[in-house]
Structure formats: C-alpha cells, structure tokens
UniProtKB/Swiss-Prot annotation:
Belongs to the NrdR family. One of its GO terms (molecular function) is ATP binding. Pfam families: ATP-cone, Zn_ribbon_NrdR. Its cofactor is Zn(2+). InterPro entries: ATP-cone_dom, NrdR-like_N, RNR_NrdR-like. The lineage of its organism: Bacteria, Bacillati, Cyanobacteriota, Cyanophyceae, Synechococcales. GO terms for biological process: negative regulation of DNA-templated transcription. Negatively regulates transcription of bacterial ribonucleotide reductase nrd genes and operons by binding to NrdR-boxes. This is Transcriptional repressor NrdR. Keywords: ATP-binding, DNA-binding, Metal-binding, Nucleotide-binding, Repressor, Transcription, Transcription regulation, Zinc, Zinc-finger. Binds 1 zinc ion. A zinc finger (unnamed) spans 3-34.
Amino acid sequence: MQCPSCQNTDSRVLESRAADAGRSVRRRRECLHCDFRFTTYERVETVPITVLKRNGNRETFNRSKILNGLTMACQKTGLEQDRLESMVNELELQLQQRSGREVNSAEIGEMVLDQLSEMSEVAYVRFASVYRHFRGINDFVAALEGIHANKEQLAAVR
C-alpha cells in the first residue's frame, strides 16, 4: 500500500478489524520509510450495478450520490452520518443480492423513501420533494398523508 505522505510502498499493518458490519476490513498501517500512520479499508469487489435513469440513460450505481442526497435531506434532523452510511450500505447490499444487474432509479428512490419514512418524517418529505419533483403544497400534504397511512397500517398489523 502506498504511503499518502511519502508515496513509499513499504508499510506494515499495525491493526486489522472488521468494519461496516463485516463487509470490509479496516487496517491501521505504518510506513516503513517515514513512520507515517494511515488507515486503509478493504472491500470485496462486486459486479457493478447499472442504474436505468428516467431519461433512458444508463450509469453505474454511485453510492455517494445517494449518501449526498440523504445528507442534505437529513440536515438538522438529528440523524447521524453513521446511520445514513449504514442505510446506504444496506441498500447497496440489497441491490447486490438481486439476480439482475440493472435497477431503475425510481426503484432505488422508493427503497430510500421506505427507510426514511421510519427514521424521520422531515427527511422523508425533503428527499421526496426532490426525488418526486414536488410542484406545490398539495404534493407535500399528500406525502405526509402517505406516511401516516403507512404507519397506521403497520400499527394495525402489530
């Protein structure tokens, strides 16, 4: 592994442990040339997922796009970044476990909204307003009514 400080390729591993619920390995390393310490993460290389966009274009799944959208939607809601990252990890895992390698962007958006509805109504409405292209107050009201209807259905089942 190349040292970020001096670019030397000789380093030793000081510590290794599982990260991201066992989906990656976190390693603390020390450069043998300059003694700089740094952290690396190893993940299993997965087959890329292709996202079918609304306009018909195809692009490779980009987890950072979802995480950025979630971060913006969750600002000042009290939801921590770690929880959002876990949510994106879970979403990516669900997509990887599918038999097909292509997924509609609409399906990804709905998966995100399902998770957000359980976490924060404010974040749900913010994300939905961008994702579903809300045009006015009626769209916001309909989204909130949808959340409450789903919660009532879940309560009736339990």
